[in-house]
Curated annotation (Swiss-Prot):
<keyword id="KW-0521">NADP</keyword>
<dbReference type="GO" id="GO:0050661">
    <property type="term" value="F:NADP binding"/>
</dbReference>
<dbReference type="GO" id="GO:0004350">
    <property type="term" value="F:glutamate-5-semialdehyde dehydrogenase activity"/>
</dbReference>
<dbReference type="InterPro" id="IPR016163">
    <property type="entry name" value="Ald_DH_C"/>
</dbReference>
<protein>
    <recommendedName>
        <fullName>Gamma-glutamyl phosphate reductase</fullName>
        <ecNumber>1.2.1.41</ecNumber>
    </recommendedName>
</protein>
<dbReference type="InterPro" id="IPR012134">
    <property type="entry name" value="Glu-5-SA_DH"/>
</dbReference>
<dbReference type="Pfam" id="PF00171">
    <property type="entry name" value="Aldedh"/>
</dbReference>
<dbReference type="InterPro" id="IPR020593">
    <property type="entry name" value="G-glutamylP_reductase_CS"/>
</dbReference>
<dbReference type="InterPro" id="IPR016162">
    <property type="entry name" value="Ald_DH_N"/>
</dbReference>
<keyword id="KW-0560">Oxidoreductase</keyword>
<dbReference type="InterPro" id="IPR000965">
    <property type="entry name" value="GPR_dom"/>
</dbReference>
<comment type="pathway">
    <text>Amino-acid biosynthesis; L-proline biosynthesis; L-glutamate 5-semialdehyde from L-glutamate: step 2/2.</text>
</comment>
<dbReference type="InterPro" id="IPR016161">
    <property type="entry name" value="Ald_DH/histidinol_DH"/>
</dbReference>
<dbReference type="GO" id="GO:0055129">
    <property type="term" value="P:L-proline biosynthetic process"/>
</dbReference>
<keyword id="KW-0028">Amino-acid biosynthesis</keyword>
<keyword id="KW-0641">Proline biosynthesis</keyword>
<dbReference type="GO" id="GO:0005737">
    <property type="term" value="C:cytoplasm"/>
</dbReference>
Length: 424
């Protein structure tokens, strides 16, 4: 264990040393590194898929549920998508070096801010191997060194991806030490990593509630946490039924294992008799289990093919990460807002309505990172928000909120131009 701890410290030291030249590397050089990464992924598809298959087989042998298994799979299509996202990050404007908030003082001093990298970012994450590439690419683009620590369930995939990323970075003339990967999945090493505040500037955990809570409780380093999503869709009395069905279906079914999938459907009592049977009929085709309150049960009890069970108090405020939806009929917008305030996690909330006043109340009163009107909750995503990709979706308010892109992993320094001024 002592040797492993020393290796962690050495990786952090190397990342810190590499962060300095990376901080002032040219945009062209950083973009070249990202394009190299994307090409390396495509050129090494057989090796990546083989490594991922090992992860899949080990996950199946351990009894991992199919819904969770989907998170760690890389196939040809997903690999091409990862490469496409990496090219997209390369095409984004470089935030580093941006000059803003310039002002001339009465004494003639010109004072403003210049955007700079944070320095070294440690990413601790579970399941999804695409996170290895997304986070490394975003950190490099923003001039940050990165320390990657994935979960044991994707160790084979992450190992080869990190190796290829380091090769691609070095080919672009940047220090490969700017990307560090921790192969050892012992949790005690994470605890040690979280104490290296002299070498690491920010920790970003991505995963389940257990991981995020552990990192928050044990870190000596600032943490920006995301990923926990208890997500609601509220169908207002003035909703367009076809839109509401499509949004509720997409929010739940399109990819149920991710944090921006809907967990609870709130339905106004005036539209529930028409809307609920319609959405239940569509959900039944996808195998969605409905956990309904008493009012919803009465409406849906004769719906053919519907997987229907009574909701329990534990179903409200629960992130299902599966084809399960809690459904509640509410008397008013006020009741919907109160329910969301009590049970929401501050991730994403959506209202479906044709009533402008209701939509504005929802936007103003719901406290979440992303609040939507007449749109699927699945849009809360870095690529969908025009960020290229994301490091995570922060449900905090400091220092970043919602999908974290390039600007969210930079800081600024004050710059001052004088002409010989001295302070009296």
């Amino acid at each position: 264990m002592e040797k492993a701890l020393l290796e962690i410290e050495e990786k952090a030291r190397l990342a810190r040393a590499a962060s300095r030249p990376l901080s002032y590397a040219s945009s062209a050089q950083k973009d070249a590194a990202l394009k190299n990464i994307a090409r390396c992924l495509l050129d090494n598809e057989p090796a990546i898929l083989e490594a991922n298959l090992k992860d899949q087989n080990e996950a199946k042998a351990s009894g991992m549920l199919p819904a969770m298994l989907d998170r760690l799979i890389i196939d040809q299509s997903r690999l091409e998508g990862i490469a496409k996202d990496t090219f997209a990050i390369a095409a984004l404007p470089d935030p580093v070096g941006e000059i803003f908030d310039m002002n001339t003082m009465p004494n003639g001093l010109i004072i403003g801010k210049k955007r700079v990298p944070l320095g070294v970012i440690a990413a601790i994450y579970e399941s999804r191997p695409n996170v290895t590439v997304d986070i490394a690419s975003l950190c490099l683009k923003a001039g940050n060194a990165v320390i990657l620590r994935g979960g044991k369930e994707t160790i084979h995939s992450n190992t080869i991806l990190a190796k290829l990323i380091r090769q691609a970075v070095e080919q672009a003339g940047l220090p490969k030490e700017a990307v560090q990967f921790i192969e050892n999945t012992d949790r005690n090493l994470v605890n040690h990593l979280l104490k290296l505040s002299d070498q690491i500037d920010l920790v970003i955990p991505r995963g389940g509630a257990g991981l995020i809570s552990y990192v928050k409780q044990n870190s000596f380093i600032p943490v920006v946490a995301g990923g926990i999503g208890v997500v609601h869709v509220y169908v207002d009395a003035d909703a367009k039924v076809t839109d509401a069905v499509n949004i509720a279906y997409n929010s739940k079914v399109q990819r149920p294992t991710v944090c921006n999938a809907m967990d609870t459907l709130l339905v106004h009592k005036d539209i529930a008799p028409v809307f609920l049977p319609a959405v239940a009929a569509e959900w039944s085709k996808a195998g969605v289990e409905i956990r309904a309150d008493e009012a919803a049960l009465k409406i849906l009890e004769n719906t053919f093919g519907c997987k229907l069970i009574p909701a329990t108090p534990d179903d409200w405020g629960k992130e299902f990460l599966a084809l399960i939806a809690a459904v509640k009929v509410v008397d008013s917008l006020d009741e919907a807002l109160s329910h969301i305030a009590r049970y929401g996690s501050g991730h994403t909330e959506s209202i479906v309505t044709q009533n402008y006043t209701s939509s504005q109340r929802f936007l103003n009163e719901v406290d979440a990172a992303a609040v939507m009107v007449n749109a699927s909750t699945r849009f809360t995503d870095g690529s969908q928000f025009g960020l290229g990709a994301e490091l995570g979706i922060s449900t905090q308010k400091m220092h970043a909120r919602g999908p974290m892109g390039l600007k969210e992993i930079t800081s600024y320094k004050w710059i001052v131009y004088g002409s010989g001024q001295i302070r009296g």
